[in-house]
Design a protein with these regions (language model features):
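Activation segment signature within eukaryotic-like protein kinase domains
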Residues: 119-120
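Conserved catalytic-loop aspartate of Hanks-type protein kinases
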Residues: 202
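Protein kinase glycine-rich loop
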Residues: 18-24, 29
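Conserved HxN/HPN-centered segment at the entrance to the catalytic loop
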Residues: 66-76
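Glycine-rich ATP phosphate-binding loop
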Residues: 28-48
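A conserved loop-to-beta-strand element in the N-lobe of protein kinase catalytic cores
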Residues: 80-93, 97, 101-102
Length: 355
C-alpha cells in the first residue's frame, strides 16, 4: 500500500465568502477569496447532522491525500452558531473548468470519443492513486469529476469514499454497510446486492461514467427511472448491461466491456485499463485554453443537484411506491430515504436496510 502524504496547502486565515455557487438539503457551496493572496477557493459548509457526517468523512479522506489527480483539501473550520448548533466548513481547491457534466452540457450533451479517451486516462490516474492508498471512491460519475482550465482531470466529492484496510473487506458488518453510499444508477451490481466492497466497484462506475460522457444520459437510460424497484433489481440481479454507445469504436467497446463485467473478480483493474489501447488514443488529444462555466461537481456529496425525484404521478399510486420500498427492504437492497421517495440519480441519504 502506498504511504499517505499530508496535503501541504495552507489554510487561509483571512478570507471573504462570495456568492453561493451550489446548494442542497445538506448545505451550501460558496466561492471564497483568500485575502492574503487574492486566490480563490471553494467553501463547503453544513450545519445538518447528515451533512456533518458526510463532510467529516470527506475531511478524513482528503486531509491525508496529495495528488495532482485529486481535488486539493486546503483546510477546515468548526464553529458554533448562536443556538449552539455545530457548523463544519471545508476549504477546497477551486477548479475553474467545472465538472464533466458541465462540459458535456456545453458541448451539446455528449463528448467526442477521443476527448473521452483523454478524460478517462485522467480519471484512471486518480483512481490509481486512491486504490494504492486503499480508498474506494464509491460515487464516481461526471458530476464528481472536475476540470482545470487546460483540461486536467481531478476526482472530487469524496463524501461517500471508504478506506479499505488490507485492500479488502469481507463480510461487511452492519455498521460499515450503513456508511456505504453512492448513486444507484452508477453503482456496481454487487454493491446493490450488499456484497463485499472492493476497488472493482469504482471500475464499474467508470464504465457507467464513460457511457454518460458519450451519450449525455444516465448509464441505464431514462426509461429505467420510471420504476425504482425494477431499476434496482435489473442492475443488481439481471444479466442485462447498460447500453453501449452505438457510435463507439471497437476499441472503445472493448474497454467498456472490461469495465462493465458483472463478475467483479473478472473486471479489469486500474493498472490493466491504463495499458488498454483506448486510453492511449487520448494521448494525441491536446486541449488548450479550455473554459466552461465554473461550478462545483456537487454539494457535500454527489447527487445534491438531483435531476429527478419520484413524484406521485411518476408512480402508479402511493401503494406502488410503498410496495417498491418494502420489496427492496425484503431483498436487502439499498433504498433512498430522501423525502420518503426513491431517487436513483442521487447519492444523498441512501442506506442499507438489511438486518
Amino acid at each position: 500500500m502506498a504511504e499517505f502524504s499530508k496535503c501541504s496547502c495552507l489554510k487561509p486565515t483571512k478570507w471573504l465568502k462570495g456568492k453561493v455557487i451550489g446548494s442542497g438539503s445538506f448545505g451550501s457551496v460558496h466561492l471564497a477569496m483568500d485575502k492574503a493572496t487574492g486566490g480563490f477557493f471553494v467553501l463547503k459548509s453544513t450545519d445538518s447532522e447528515a451533512g456533518f457526517k458526510c463532510l467529516e468523512n470527506e475531511v478524513e479522506i482528503l486531509e491525508n491525500l496529495d495528488s495532482p489527480h485529486i481535488v486539493k483539501f486546503i483546510g477546515k473550520d468548526l464553529s458554533f452558531e448562536a443556538n449552539g448548533k455545530r457548523k463544519l466548513s471545508l476549504f477546497l481547491e477551486f477548479m475553474t473548468g467545472g465538472s464533466l457534466a458541465d462540459v458535456a452540457e456545453k458541448f451539446g450533451g455528449s463528448l467526442d470519443e477521443e476527448v473521452i479517451c483523454l478524460y478517462t486516462k485522467g480519471i484512471l490516474k486518480g483512481l490509481k492513486y486512491l486504490h494504492e492508498n486503499g480508498i474506494v471512491h464509491c460515487d464516481l460519475k461526471c458530476k464528481n469529476i472536475l476540470l482545470g482550465t487546460s483540461g486536467e482531470i481531478k476526482l472530487a466529492d469524496l463524501g461517500c469514499a471508504k478506506r479499505i484496510k488490507d485492500h479488502k473487506v469481507k463480510g461487511i458488518t452492519k455498521s460499515l454497510s450503513k456508511s456505504i453510499g453512492g448513486t444507484p444508477l452508477w453503482m456496481a451490481p454487487e454493491i446493490l446486492r450488499n456484497e463485499e466492497l472492493d476497488f472493482a466497484a469504482d471500475i464499474w462506475s467508470l464504465g457507467c461514467t464513460i457511457i454518460e460522457m458519450a451519450t449525455g444520459k444516465t448509464p441505464w437510460g431514462g426509461d429505467i427511472c420510471t420504476n425504482p424497484l425494477a431499476a434496482v433489481l435489473k442492475i443488481a440481479c439481471s444479466n442485462e448491461m447498460p447500453q453501449f454507445p452505438s457510435h463507439f469504436s471497437d476499441v472503445g467497446l472493448d474497454f467498456l466491456a472490461k469495465c462493465l463485467e458483472r463478475d467483479s473478480k473478472k473486471r479489469w483493474k486500474v493498472e490493466q485499463l491504463l495499458d488498454h489501447p483506448f486510453v492511449s488514443k487520448g494521448n494525441s488529444v491536446k486541449i488548450k485554453n479550455f473554459k466552461v462555466a465554473s461550478t462545483p461537481a456537487s454539494v457535500l456529496d454527489g447527487g445534491i443537484f438531483s435531476e429527478m425525484d419520484f413524484s406521485d404521478d411518476q408512480l402508479s399510486s402511493d401503494e406502488d411506491e410503498s410496495t417498491s420500498g418494502n420489496a427492496l427492504r425484503d431483498h436487502g437492497f439499498w433504498i433512498s430515504t430522501r423525502g420518503g421517495k426513491m431517487d436513483l440519480e442521487s447519492s444523498e441519504s441512501w442506506i442499507n436496510v438489511r438486518n
